């Protein structure tokens, strides 16, 4: 995996990009950026809504074929997450990340990760070379609204 540290400022990281971040003092995680400061995020019946608009997530299509239960991503709203104080909008300086393997992902939905602080982000993943059958740099198919 190749990571761009140039994008570390988050000025060059967009919703839908895959990022690497410090989850704790010993581990870095790789997850997809779903929400930025000021965004409201909701999952309802396996559908992502970002600021009230439906967002397609084609990168989840393979995982949805193998899900256990009714939904790959359980229903939640950004206001339910630790660090939002019940507000629907993600607070200033915070970021919401989710793993593509939603049913087995330790991500912003879990208190142990929660919403990320800007300084936790190491950079944006720009090239994946493992597994070989998914080699490439297309992590954000352009489905997120600007």
Question: What is the predicted role of each segment?
Answer:
Residues 2-146:
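Soluble "head" domains of membrane/secretory-pathway proteins
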